[in-house]
Amino acid sequence: FSAYADTCYAVDQMGLVADLSGYLTDEEKAAFPESYLTEGDFDDNGTIKIFPVAKSTELLFLNDTDWQTFAAATGASYDDLSTVEGLVATAGKYYDWTDARTEVPDDGKALFGRDAMANYMLIAAKELGSTIFTVENGKMTVNLTEDVARKLWENYYVPFVKGWFAGEGRFRSDDIKTGNVLAYVGSNSSATFFPKQVQVSDTESHDISLKVLPNPSFAGSEEVAVQQGAGMVVTKSTPEEEAACVTFLKWFTQPENNIQFAVGSGYLPVTHAADDMTAIENSGLDLTD
């Protein structure tokens, strides 16, 4: 069954999850990034309890059509969105610009939203040199410093309070659809849900185009990116049934099959061979969308 690490861990605590490490050779294991295989190694002893099939990271998705109008009027550029600080400053400019377009005071619009606040906290803290928590021998230790916590606050919650950031729909792509925001950071797989129109009202809508940019990082920091995604978990059974499951998963993650799945779903390939732009371009699959 498909599961994230937290679900797999809960089932593993019941003694129901099979260790798949014995069904793969060292060469087969080397086909995957090490961090993908160790995600389910809960006891840090080389077990493989989550077989990677789909991964994602985060990107910035932009309503480029309406952005171009704003950029032409204010001189804003894509480079302004490359850092967290630049994003916040640009969001402030966008709020002021939209506010000035009407006679109603303080009715500016938000520029930006995030799908996963937790990812921002974890990744941004690491960029700032602080791992929020560590776990050793089953014990968690919180390491977040006051300075880092304040910087995270000032670049996320403060813009929310000021109306520069927003999050009203279930997902930020919903807020793009209604025109509540122009941009959001979310999973690369969410590209398939990016709307082709903004529905301003029941009677007014307009077409938009998508621009994809890197997830902004803190200025001067070492860039850090999240890797996430559900994998396949095999419940304990007979050796023959477990081996059959692994045989299928090996087939599913062969480069040609993994590329086809990744292109069709918007997820990242999970093997080194499939995670290659030349191989993807040579696959013959339609990459225009």
Q: Whereabouts are the PLM-identified features?
A:
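Mature extracytoplasmic/periplasmic domains
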Residues: 174, 189-192, 196-200, 230-289
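Hinge/lid segment of periplasmic solute-binding proteins
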Residues: 4-59, 125, 205-216, 281-288
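Short glycine- and hydrophobic/aromatic-rich loop-to-beta-strand nucleating segment
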Residues: 58-62, 232-233
